[in-house]
Every structure is written in C-alpha cells, then in structure tokens.
Amino acid sequence: ANKKNSMKPMLDASGDQALWYTGEEIVVFDFGSNTEVWRETVKCKKSKAPNFAYYCFGMLSPRQSKAAYRVTEDEYVLVDLKSAQKVVIPNAGWHPFFSPDDQCFSVGGKFYLTQTGEEMDNPFPFSVRQGLSFSDTCAVRTRGSLMAVQQDRGSSPIELWDTGSGQLLATIDDPFVVRQVNFAFTKSGLVLHTDCGAMSIYSCAL
C-alpha cells in the first residue's frame, strides 16, 4: 500500500480483538471467542491534504469496550461495542487516544467522555500539547494504569506515567533515537525500536 493512501492503515488490536477496514466496512472481531463483535458500512472520504489520500482511521480502546473511527475531515465517531450506540465527536484534530479505563477519548488536545461525547477537563496527569499537526508526534501506549507518552517530535523523550497515582515514573531519552522511534508495551516492560535499528528494552512493573 502507498504510504499516502491514508492517515494510517485502519488496523488496530487490543487484547483478543482486532479492528480493520475491508474497503467497504469496519470490522471488529474477537479472536479469543472467534466471534464478530461489530461491523459498520462506511466510505472513507478523499482528502485534499498533501500528506494522505483518504481519511481512514480506526482504533480500539484499552479495555475493548469502545472503538473510534474517522472517515471524514471534521469528526470522529465513538462506538460502544456492546450496545453498538454511536457518539459523534466534532473535531478535525489529530492524534487520538483513549484513557486506560475507556472513559475518556482525547483528540486534537481536547477531551471527551466516551459515553456521551461531552467535552471535559484533562483527566490525565500529563498535559497534552495543543495545536499539533498531522506531521507532529503525539504517541500514546497504554498497559494497565501505565501510559507511555511522546509528544512534539518523533525524537522527543518518552514519559512513563502511572495514571493511578498520577506519578511520572521515568523519562526515557534513548541515545539510539535520531529522528524517530516506535515503542510498545510487552508483558514485562517497554520496548523501543529506533531508527538506528537498535532495540532497547526498559523493564517496568506492569
């Protein structure tokens, strides 16, 4: 697939569930129980932006109770995967993520209750940068109450927060990162894959 095909391939996984776009429908499937959870017919709108061709984004929440997707320029849709009820979030911003308890959805530096779509104050112990563009970085990874957060640029330090206590546990400024790093939680730590080809593993109590 061409890099400019979409904002990001509409593919995500959380727990035993996976979300993907078939070209006509968004599907959420539970591979643990081998059952389809939710399906919706959508059409991804063509973009006028130079960075990507279509608005085509979807993600699952950490506890797999919600999904979020964007197929047009100025709104996100939150879906309750048990009731299939939808809430529309009017927001043309970038870099969406859920809170660890699935109760809050953040995008474009704003925060919303996932049940109602009502805007709320920042519930996180860290501030979220305002005005970040598509090409800026706001990457968030969640495991239990831990959140690893990187903002501004792909080479910025990664902060590890415990949302339960509100404490900043660590700031990781990996020496092998030049311009970009990808990071993810494993069962026992946080793994960084840098643009130097190095793999760094940081242990943390999960």
Give each language-model segment a name.
Residues 26, 58-60, 70:
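Plant-skewed but cross-kingdom recognition/interaction modules and surfaces
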Residues 19, 68, 106, 146-149, ...:
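Structural core positions within WD40/WD-like beta-propeller blades
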Residues 1, 6-9, 14-24, 30-31:
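A generic tandem-repeat structural signature
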Residues 14-16, 63-65, 101-103, 144-145, ...:
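Short coil/turn segments that connect the beta-strands within blades of beta-propeller domains
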Residues 153-155, 197-198:
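Short glycine/acidic-enriched loop and turn motifs that connect beta-strands
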Residues 178-206:
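Blade-level signature of beta-propeller repeat domains, shared across WD40, Kelch, NHL, RCC1
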